[in-house]
Amino acid sequence: MTVSDDTRALDGFEALAALIWTVPFFRSLERVSCARLIGALEEVTVPAGTVLALEGGDADALYLIETGEVSVTVRTPEGERVLGTLRGPAYFGEMGLLLGRRTASVHAASDIRAWRLSRERFEQIVRQQPSIAMAVATTLAELLDQRARQYAGAPVVARESQPLRFEPPPAARPRIWRMLGFALTIGVPAVLWGLSPPSRLNLEGWHVLLVVLGAAIGWLLEPVPDFVIALAVPAAWGIAGLVTPAAALAGFSTPAWFMALGALGLAAAMLRSGLLLRIALRLLRVFPSTHFGQMLALLASGVVITPLLPLGLARVAAIAPLTQELAESLGYPPRSRARAGLLFAGLVGHTAFSPVFLTGLVMNFFVLDLLPSAERAHFGWVTWLASAVPAGVIILVGAILTLRFGLHPEVAPRTGAETRRRQEYVLGPISRDEQVTLAAIGILMAGLVFQPVLHVDLTWPAVVALIVLIVAGTLNRQDFRASIDWGFLALFGVLLGTGGVMRQVGIDRWIAGFLAPLAQAAGSPELLLVILAVLVVVGRLVLPWIPATLLLSVALVPVGPQIGLSAWTVGFVVLAAANTWLHPRQSDVYRLAREMTKGEMSTDAQGFLVGAAMTVATLLGIAACTPYWRALGLLGR
């Protein structure tokens, strides 16, 4: 592309952005939301005489006219009446998106070049971008207010609106299901409470274990949110007189809890500032515009972003809409192999490598906190990565092979590079909030990487990074309250304390005794690790991802040294194996991606194919790493 071509392209991008902001619904959109909106637009050229909308018909799209002229008419008892003409830059169809029907007919008076936003994509974007929904509501309220004032003869007051953030409420479960969940969550431990404890477990430990069993049933059936069940665990222990409040709630004062708090604040800043979107768009431009090239770009995006954003669901929430916009721009039909390949490249890329980086997942900090003190001091950010990278490479190779040969495209793509360039243009130069977020990331990563030299606990870089974000104004008081998942932190803190309680009452020794025959039957630590990985995969068939990971970590990590394994290898196996799925409904991240793309990107059969293949790749990665871990002294202790 020549300099003049670049100039013309930039002028075109500026014109399109200006055209979007002429629509009342979109005037208050920030640049990040506007960039996401551009990805959903479809460029169309229409010859003169074409009927674009018919009065009374279904409203299928909003049109942004870049060049050309259209005539707007309505039917009257006297015949068709011309209301006027629209000459580009202009728009029409915005009310039809809300009403579902056309209020006038529109004919192309000349050849026109326009951008089309389908009603289906508009509704989808509203779900993905709450700020757009609030902008629509604000615009309608202002129109009603202005008309009421005009009718009453009062002066019209101009208002500046600020888009607010809100999340749609989760779908409610049937009442009978919730009642059954409550009954089993409370009833099963109550029925077993009076029984004698198993061999080698004291009565206090048995009762502590029954409360955890009730929590596991609650997490499976979900009569209430998972963090409510977690909070009920220390409450039940305290009411039963099993542990003191200080012991039950000790997890909220651990370094891992504050590391998680800092990491979640950093995740919120990356999402709000647009830094995550900018990184993904830049990588999509670097790789070839072929289907395989874009899949590699999405995988690479995950490898780059995962250590920077330790929240898998947030990464998927950001990348899933981008994969759909990419599929639309490349012209792939719904639920085709080509579309599924893009979705799963983004999904696998932004989740499969979470256990490889210490900062890849908040739950990694949980495992770190469960390690014996000497082992915890050994595993900094670099040591964790060095120990896990061979498994990560095998998982990456498995992902590439699965996507390349299992989800190859049925048709050749059309170019979609121009859409990415338009989105990057609207994002503009890197903003101050992005710069502050990058500085906070730098503080965190420098503290983690150089921790062995600085001799500073891993907690403090995360806390300092969060302070920088708040002091600089990138996260304000409202953002701190609304953008951090406090429910997850409640669950996280309770389960951090659960490990100490289980050690206090001897449950860890009882589990070690239970696993000892399995270790002897395995005959080698290598085989034992693979067996544990398979058992975790089986456990995930029953329990949801987050509770399963945390609960299995609490149960298995502390007993690793007692059965000839380092606690870290057991923790890594739990993190990696629990991160897989066989049936798509097992995976929180897959269900989130399907919801955000309205099920248009893939089928459950394709999800099963990818899930099964990645489960095999993960198990192979664990098995292949065992000689490496033995060489590092992590096996055969």
Model region roles, listed by residue range:
Residues 2-48:
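Cyclic nucleotide-binding regulatory module and flanking cytosolic helices
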Residues 15-16, 33-36, 102-103, 120-160:
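A small-molecule sensor/coupling module
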Residues 46, 50-111:
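Cyclic nucleotide-binding regulatory domains
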Residues 138-165, 181, 315, 334-428, ...:
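Juxtamembrane and boundary regions of transmembrane helices in multi-pass small-molecule transporters
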Residues 152-259, 383-513, 613-637:
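Hydrophobic transmembrane alpha-helices of multi-pass small-molecule transporters
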Residues 214-221, 268-282, 286, 469-482, ...:
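C-terminal ends of transmembrane helices
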Residues 216-225, 302-311, 347-358, 447-453, ...:
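Transmembrane alpha-helix interface/packing and boundary motifs in multi-pass membrane proteins
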Residues 227-333, 484-563, 636:
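Membrane-embedded alpha-helical segments and adjacent helix-loop junctions characteristic
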